[in-house]
């Protein structure tokens, strides 16, 4: 016949409370030595389970975000890019912009850190259990085009609209045909004033009509993107070129 301690361990394992079962002995000893109350003991024991589950949830949310890398804001070299307001980026990391369904646009040449910063904000959001998804513009349009051919466009648009934060990377790096531009507009329109979107682009807004090959459609997209948006213009050298020369010097 099991004693009470053994039965409690069995019960915790049966309920799949693995961390509580694993730390039960240590918590009981700590409770006795420090004269904790029954409630205080339970709080300490359940905290082990909650901490692990929270970490697992964070890991899952970050993984679901499909980020290209795990680069966070503390890895960004603000000294190399002095045109960037560090405090502004840290404010983005606080996720205050999500509460107002505001957008962020990172504008600048290739290699200046647009994707790094967008990813950093996305990871911060995912860690706060905010539904977040990262996708390159070309891949997004290919997915929407395929969905349209397969008569499931509405479902796919709803899929990308459901994320509280959607990050669309590299707008303008590849040409966008008129039909794809219409698909892009549909998504932006569905998210407008309902969800936050982060965009990265190397194309000045005046040239978006060339990217989307339709001035009216480009203006409609810009109108919805920029209405509640903060634009971060980055002027500086490429990190990749800097790293290349650093390796040559080594």
From Swiss-Prot:
GO biological process, one term: DNA replication
Pfam families: IstB_IS21
Keywords for this protein: ATP-binding, Nucleotide-binding, Transposable element
Domain of life: Bacteria
InterPro entries (UniProt xref): AAA+_ATPase (IPR003593), ClpA/B (IPR001270), DNAC/IstB-like (IPR028350), IstB (IPR047661), IstB_ATP-bd (IPR002611), P-loop_NTPase (IPR027417)
CDD domains: AAA
Disulphide linkage map: none
Residues noted as binding ATP in the record, renumbered to the chain: 108-115
Molecular function via GO: ATP binding; ATP hydrolysis activity
Keyword flag GTP-binding: no
Family listed: Belongs to the IS21/IS1162 putative ATP-binding protein family.
Protein name as annotated: Insertion sequence IS232 putative ATP-binding protein
């Amino acid at each position: 016949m099991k004693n009470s301690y053994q039965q409690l361990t069995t019960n915790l394992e049966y309920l799949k409370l693995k961390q509580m079962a694993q730390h039960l002995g240590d918590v009981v000893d700590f409770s006795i030595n420090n004269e904790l109350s029954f409630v205080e003991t339970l709080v300490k024991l359940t905290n082990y389970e909650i901490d692990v589950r929270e970490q697992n949830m964070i890991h899952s949310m970050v993984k679901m975000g499909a980020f290209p890398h795990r680069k966070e804001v503390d890895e960004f070299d603000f000294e190399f890019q002095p045109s960037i307001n560090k405090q502004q980026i840290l404010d983005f990391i606080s996720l205050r912009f999500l509460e107002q369904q505001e957008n962020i646009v990172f504008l600048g040449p290739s290699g200046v850190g647009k994707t790094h910063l967008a990813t950093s904000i996305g990871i911060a959001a995912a860690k706060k259990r905010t539904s977040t998804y990262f996708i390159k513009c070309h891949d997004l349009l290919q997915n929407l085009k395929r969905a349209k051919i397969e008569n499931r466009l509405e479902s796919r648009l709803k899929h990308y609209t459901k994320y509280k934060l959607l990050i669309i990377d590299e707008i303008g790096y590849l040409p966008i045909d008129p039909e794809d531009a219409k698909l892009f507009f549909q998504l932006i329109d569905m998210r407008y004033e309902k969800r936050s979107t982060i965009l990265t682009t190397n194309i000045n807004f005046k040239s978006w009509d060339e990217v989307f090959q339709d001035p009216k459609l480009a203006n409609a997209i810009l109108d919805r993107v920029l209405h509640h948006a903060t634009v971060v213009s980055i002027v500086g050298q490429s990190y990749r070129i800097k790293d290349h020369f650093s390796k040559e010097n080594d």
